[in-house]
Amino acid sequence: MSILKEIYEYKIDFVNKQKKLHTQSDILSKLKNITSHDFSFSKKLKDEMSRTSIIGELKRASPSLGNFVNEEINLSNIAQIYEECGVSCLSVLTDEKYFKGGIEDLIEIRKISTLPILRKDFIVDEYQIYES
């Protein structure tokens, strides 16, 4: 089996389990209580065309680098440092199996940062979009 097929099958199974824990209806009802902000990733990059834009990546592991893992890393602290240093946007890896992240990382970063955030994951279902 190819690695992409393996990832796809794993992610389909994982998302189906998540749907049983938190239904899409539950997620949509929570979204109604969220205050709207302008977190447009593409708009932020276009607005800063006069300077080099940097996207700060936040991840706990990297399979391409020999699968180093640092699950104890404080992503919120790193996000704050990135913001203080002037990054334009943030990218948060939320894949559990391969990058040791989670949707909780995305939620935590959103609480402390006003920058646009990209959820970086293997997206296989619209459920994940609403979850983001």
PLM features: residue spans?
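Short beta-strand elements of ligand-binding domains
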Residues: R119-D121
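Conserved N-terminal beta1-alpha1 strand-loop-helix module at the mouth
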Residues: M1-I117
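Catalytic cores of alpha/beta
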Residues: V124-E131
